[in-house]
From Swiss-Prot:
Its EC number is 2.7.1.2. It comes from the Bacteria. It catalyses: D-glucose + ATP = D-glucose 6-phosphate + ADP + H(+). One of its GO terms (molecular function) is ATP binding. NCBIfam families: glk, PRK00292.1-1, PRK00292.1-3, PRK12408.1. Belongs to the bacterial glucokinase family. ATP binds at A8, D9, I10, G11, G12, T13. The keyword Cytoplasm applies. Signal peptide: none annotated. This is Glucokinase.
Amino acid sequence: MNLYGLVADIGGTNARLALCNLENGVIERIETYSAKQHAGLESIISHYLAEQKTVVTYACIAIACPINGDWVEMTNHQWAFSISELKRTLGLEKLDVINDFTAVSMAIPMLTEEYKLQLGGGEAVKDKPIAVYGAGTGLGVAHLIKVDKQWVSLPGEGGHVDFAANSEEQDAILAVLRRKFGHVSVERILSGSGLVNLYQAIAILDHRQPEDLEPETVTQRALDKSCQYCHRALTLFCEIMGRFGGNLALNMGTFGGVYIAGGIVPRFLDFFRQSNFLHGFEDKGRFKPLVQQIPVYLITHPQPGLLGSGTYLRQQLSLID
């Protein structure tokens, strides 16, 4: 067997590629490319392997979209491809293409304590269901369950469920966003663009003309308190992150923990920890005592998508006990 397998984490903005040591799962030689600068996935993979002067026969690619059959179309990018054709073109013996949050979920059993920050709740119960979600370009969601000796990821498109307003203020925001989008999914709020949507809706409700800001600008103005609408948007973002996470905890009784991934929250971690996130997570009425037992963590590993892709590949090759 070739010592290395190719692993990739393909998002709407960036494509991260690496080699996974199939014996021990260590992720090596990580490179990040702009998805906008390449015509397609085959181009990026070929470029990476040429740079590394490496030939691989096994690969696992995590990608930000539903995987239903051979044809794959990305949700937040124009790329589309055939899995079988990509496998043939790259000369691979095995190619697994999985949802990006399938990969993130598969990383969780491999995380050491240094790569997870507990935000609340009790102790995780061994081998119980796990939930993971994260805001970035979009909102990813997955669950993880233990079946016999293997972890099985249950991916889905949970970011596209209806946004559930929980106050009069949120009702008003929902009405503004409904006029703009029609269907308002929770991803319209819990994502980079969603943070901007929140800011703009809050400004409109105060009869002001919102600026066309980038998510990073909304965050910065919130943190330095130079814009009351940005500050309120980030405050609500944190609370709604908690409410959504608490919903996931209830859905499957995730006593193994609820994990937050994604690139947004670490940018304002101190603000997040002092926010109403945990209140939102636990505010489940009669079931508050139950949810308070469930631990909630922030994943601090720099590349959980690559780590999880490697774990998935090694498990498929029966290299993990």
